[in-house]
């Protein structure tokens, strides 16, 4: 019985990640690109292999991602509800908080 429940949970998490990945690609990808790093300061440094700012982070909770997206910070503008719904942003935030992309 526990194996069945675990399998259903794994399928649910996989479906949530797929939905989050699709939303991230369509709603955030124009700036962050499919690897999630986006602009040069956030991405891996060419040539020396050092990590970019986002790759160094291991504490991006879903709540933090959601708040930053709604309010904006630094060079990242806020994302209004008319562009990305609360539910879509929640799915994106959960996807990113799981270490994706």
Can you name each region flagged by the protein language model?
Residues 7-23, 39:
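Electrostatic cytochrome c docking/interface patches
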Residues 1-3:
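Sec-dependent N-terminal signal peptides
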Residues 21-50, 67, 98-101:
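Periplasmic/extracellular electron-transfer cofactor-ligation site
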Residues 46-100:
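Extracytoplasmic electron-transfer domains, predominantly the class I c-type cytochrome c fold
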């Amino acid at each position: 019985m526990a194996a069945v429940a675990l399998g259903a949970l794994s399928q649910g998490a996989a479906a949530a990640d797929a939905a989050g990945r699709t939303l991230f690609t369509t709603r955030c990808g124009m700036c962050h690109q499919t690897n999630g790093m986006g602009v040069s300061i956030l991405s891996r440094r060419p040539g020396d292999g050092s990590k970019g700012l986002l790759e160094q982070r291991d504490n991006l909770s879903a709540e933090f991602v959601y708040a930053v997206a709604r309010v904006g910070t630094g060079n990242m503008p806020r994302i209004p509800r008319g562009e990305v719904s609360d539910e879509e942003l929640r799915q994106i935030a959960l996807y990113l908080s799981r270490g994706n992309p």
